[in-house]
């Protein structure tokens, strides 16, 4: 029997979705990036045939996301800002090869300290972010934790006291234009006293309040010549009349609405369950619904109708940010050290123009890997294994070659040898779901059911839509009866 801790990890990242969600992503040519600070994950939501693939990456309390059309991505975490860059040339090399159309690699990690970072956005002069703990909008530079650029007139000083719970940010023409806050208070945590109806939507350039009396507003957005806001305490999506401040509800949803992005007539909205705690007690949503949902809901903004949803189960209970990746359908995001970070180089265009690559042959180790792939696809497993071994003798840190050698050895029923190589793969790349699944296959054939179950469950945790691993786990459980 597995321990209770191990069995508890079997289902934490499961999700269900409407059948039209994958087709909708395919038709729009998009994927989604979702942050869940409560679960400590960034989720890539990708269509995979007729299924939806939710691909999880681990970061410490990820919240704000900022993505632009040049391939830059920034993620705010508990005390850092991670900056990534899409490196398209790496994407075809990521396992399974030929499936990915984008690969985001880290370029910079900036230490902010614990500032409770909320929404972020790229602007004309770099990255802007909401510093909720110090109640201000900030930019960054290399010498400072953060550079305060704006605070509301009702906040009298910079202090790590979360005086008004500034949270949402929208840019217009490359500069901050709209923000949301949960109160207009100037004392430590003062917004909590009237959280149900103390929220405001503000104009940044004028520092004027556009709309007041809102219930925990988040995520202001300017889209389609209209100002949108999520009135989270109501669980609603609404438009705002900029001249009068009137709120016009468009849709009410079964959760705490926070995080939104648009594509065409569709809004992709994050929903959170919200805990029964002092923070969320007494808001309209908890009075309207005894049970709330966590996931991504898709709303037609013209009709207000819900057209699709992705619902997270078990451990994922709160969503912060939702971003659409336009023109990218199957992205990868690396946050851990791996061979791609060691061997991928991004250069300025001026330098790239002087890089000579046309006559550079494959290295001997790369040629061995290439020969191994050819032999494998031709069904010559022993020959493929020889090529992979030769390449690993030259370059022992080729994890792709070691993984392929491991699965060949499992196919050849050389269980112990396969386990030896696959364990090295997961030691280097702990998120390699396919390697964990192959380890499970090897262990089940060695009658080591405990280890087999652990690796199948680990593969499913890493990729909840990994049907092969689920089927293998079902077989194992049947054998254990």
What residue spans do the PLM features occupy?
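Sequence-structural signature of mature extracellular/luminal beta-sheet repeat domains
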Residues: 2-366, 370, 379, 413, ...
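Short, charge-rich amphipathic alpha-helical segments embedded
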Residues: 390-408
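Helix-start (N-cap) detector for alpha-helical repeat units in TPR-like alpha-solenoids
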Residues: 365, 399-400, 415, 433-434, ...
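Alpha-helical protein-protein interaction scaffolds
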Residues: 434, 438-441
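Structural signature of tandem alpha-helical TPR/SEL1-like repeats
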Residues: 371, 377-390, 411-424, 431, ...
């Amino acid at each position: 029997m597995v321990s209770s801790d191990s069995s508890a990890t079997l289902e934490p990242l499961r999700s269900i979705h409407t059948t039209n969600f994958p087709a909708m992503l395919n038709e729009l040519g998009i994927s989604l990036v979702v942050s869940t600070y409560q679960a400590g994950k960034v989720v890539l939501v990708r269509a995979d045939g007729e299924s939806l693939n939710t691909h999880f990456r681990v970061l410490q309390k990820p919240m704000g996301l900022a993505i632009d059309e040049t391939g830059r991505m920034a993620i705010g975490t508990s005390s850092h800002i991670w900056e990534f860059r899409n490196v398209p040339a790496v994407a075809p090399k990521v396992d399974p090869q030929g499936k990915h159309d984008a690969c985001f690699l880290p370029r910079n990690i900036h230490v902010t300290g614990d500032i409770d970072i909320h929404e972020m956005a790229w602007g004309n002069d770099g990255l802007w972010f909401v510093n909720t703990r110090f109640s201000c909008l900030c930019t960054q530079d290399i010498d400072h934790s953060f550079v305060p650029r704006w605070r509301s007139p009702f906040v009298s000083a910079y202090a790590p006291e979360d005086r008004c719970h500034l949270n949402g940010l929208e840019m217009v023409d490359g500069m901050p234009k709209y923000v949301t806050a949960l109160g207009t208070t100037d004392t430590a945590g003062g917004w909590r006293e009237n959280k149900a109806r103390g929220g405001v939507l503000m104009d940044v350039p004028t520092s004027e309040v556009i709309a007041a009396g809102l219930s925990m507003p988040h995520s202001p957005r300017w889209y389609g010549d209209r100002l949108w806001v999520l009135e989270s305490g109501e669980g609603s999506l609404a438009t705002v009349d900029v001249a009068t401040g009137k709120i016009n509800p468009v849709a009410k949803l079964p959760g705490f609405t926070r995080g939104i992005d648009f594509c065409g007539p569709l809004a992709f909205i994050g929903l959170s369950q919200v805990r029964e705690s002092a923070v969320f007690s007494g808001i309209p949503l908890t009075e309207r619904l005894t049970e709330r949902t966590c996931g991504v809901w898709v709303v037609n903004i013209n009709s207000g109708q819900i057209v699709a949803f992705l619902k997270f189960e078990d451990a994922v209970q709160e969503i912060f940010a939702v971003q659409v990746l336009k023109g990218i359908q199957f992205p990868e995001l690396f946050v851990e050290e791996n061979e791609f970070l060691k061997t991928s180089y991004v250069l300025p265009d001026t330098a790239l123009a002087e890089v000579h690559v046309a006559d550079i042959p494959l290295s001997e180790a790369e040629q061995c890997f290439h020969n191994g792939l050819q032999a494998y696809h031709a069904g010559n497993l022993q020959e493929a294994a020889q090529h992979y071994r030769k390449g690993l003798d030259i370059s022992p840190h080729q994890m792709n070659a070691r993984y392929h050698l491991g699965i060949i050895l499992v196919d050849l029923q050389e269980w112990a040898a396969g386990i030896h190589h696959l364990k090295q793969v997961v030691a280097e790349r702990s998120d390699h779901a396919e390697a964990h699944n192959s380890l499970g296959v090897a262990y089940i054939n060695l009658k080591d059911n405990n280890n087999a179950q652990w690796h199948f469950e680990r593969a499913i945790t890493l990729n909840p839509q990994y049907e092969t691993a689920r089927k293998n786990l079902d077989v194992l459980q049947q054998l254990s009866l």
